[in-house]
């Protein structure tokens, strides 16, 4: 299956993408991973992307699309893939359609993870990360540490990342509504969108997504 996963920041896209990709035995292709891999391997595309990022500019669509194309042409993606973070706008969605068409392929489904805005803000703004090990993540409401401000695992100081402040989260949501949300209508016109409630236990959200994919087959 060839799937696109969309949803606002904090809807749990990364978590669900990993779980769905494992269940469906297809690679999880995230734009964040693509950028990191190309930059660390110093590919031509990676060098190009880094030059834009270092200048404080957005990486042009054609660079992102070229990276996605390279990844989708890898042998492990022959049987399908799950795209997370791409396409990010309508022009990228159109480019993806053209790309797939030239290969004689098409998307099977677009999963739209929906979560109320206040819930998204609460999820992200409540995150606290360990200064010693960024993988040690807690939440002031859902998974609080035993001692406030102290990592349960290593005793390191817990802090709120700048990206996780309420003001920054609301700005990111604004960008999502303006740039990314229009692709949902674009894909709805092709009959590809399944809306998934991204609230409740993680397992339940995964179950809803898999059920929606079964209905679309």
From Swiss-Prot:
Region described as LID: spans on this chain: 126-164
Keywords from the UniProt entry: ATP-binding, Cytoplasm, Kinase, Nucleotide biosynthesis, Nucleotide-binding, Transferase
GO cellular component, one term: cytoplasm
Region annotation (NMP) ranges: 30-59
Catalytic activity of the protein: AMP + ATP = 2 ADP
InterPro entries, alphabetized: Adenyl_kin_sub, Adenylat/UMP-CMP_kin, Adenylat_kinase_CS, Adenylate_kinase_lid-dom, Guanylate_kin-like_dom, P-loop_NTPase
Entry's localization field: Cytoplasm
Key word Nucleotide-binding present: yes
Positions bound to ATP: 10-15, 127, 137-138, 200
One of the GO BP terms on file: nucleoside monophosphate metabolic process
Pathway the protein takes part in: Purine metabolism; AMP biosynthesis via salvage pathway; AMP from ADP: step 1/1
EC number: 2.7.4.3
GO molecular function ontology, one term from the record: nucleoside diphosphate kinase activity
Residue positions binding AMP: 31, 36, 57-59, 85-88, 92, 161, 172
EC top class named in words: transferase
Function: Catalyzes the reversible transfer of the terminal phosphate group between ATP and AMP. Plays an important role in cellular energy homeostasis and in adenine nucleotide metabolism.
Subunit and interaction comment: Monomer.
PANTHER family (UniProt xref): NUCLEOTIDE KINASE
UniProt similarity note: Belongs to the adenylate kinase family.
Domain notes: Consists of three domains, a large central CORE domain and two small peripheral domains, NMPbind and LID, which undergo movements during catalysis. The LID domain closes over the site of phosphoryl transfer upon ATP binding. Assembling and dissambling the active center during each catalytic cycle provides an effective means to prevent ATP hydrolysis.
Name this polypeptide is given: Adenylate kinase
Organism of derivation: Streptomyces coelicolor (strain ATCC BAA-471 / A3(2) / M145)
Gene: adk
């Amino acid at each position: 299956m060839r799937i696109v996963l969309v949803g606002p920041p904090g809807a749990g896209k990364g978590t669900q993408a990993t779980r769905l990709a494992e269940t469906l035995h297809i690679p999880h292709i995230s734009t964040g991973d693509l950028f990191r891999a190309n930059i660390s391997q110093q590919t031509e595309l990676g060098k190009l992307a880094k030059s834009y990022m270092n200048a404080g500019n957005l990486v042009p669509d054609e660079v992102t699309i070229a990276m996605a194309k390279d990844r989708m042409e890898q042998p492990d993606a022959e049987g399908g893939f799950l795209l997370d973070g791409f396409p990010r706008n309508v022009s990228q969605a159109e480019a993806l359609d053209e790309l797939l068409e030239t290969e004689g392929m098409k998307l099977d489904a677009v999963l739209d993870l929906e979560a109320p805005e206040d819930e998204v803000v609460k999820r992200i703004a409540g995150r606290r990360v360990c200064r010693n090990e960024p993988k040690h993540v807690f939440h002031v409401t859902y998974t609080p540490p035993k001692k406030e401000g102290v990592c349960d695992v290593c005793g390191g100081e817990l802090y709120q990342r700048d990206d996780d402040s309420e003001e920054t989260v609301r700005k990111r949501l604004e960008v999502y509504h303006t740039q990314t949300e229009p692709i949902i209508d674009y894909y709805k016109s092709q009959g590809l969108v399944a809306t998934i409630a991204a609230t409740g236990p993680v397992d339940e959200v995964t179950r809803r997504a898999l059920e929606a994919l079964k209905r679309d087959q």
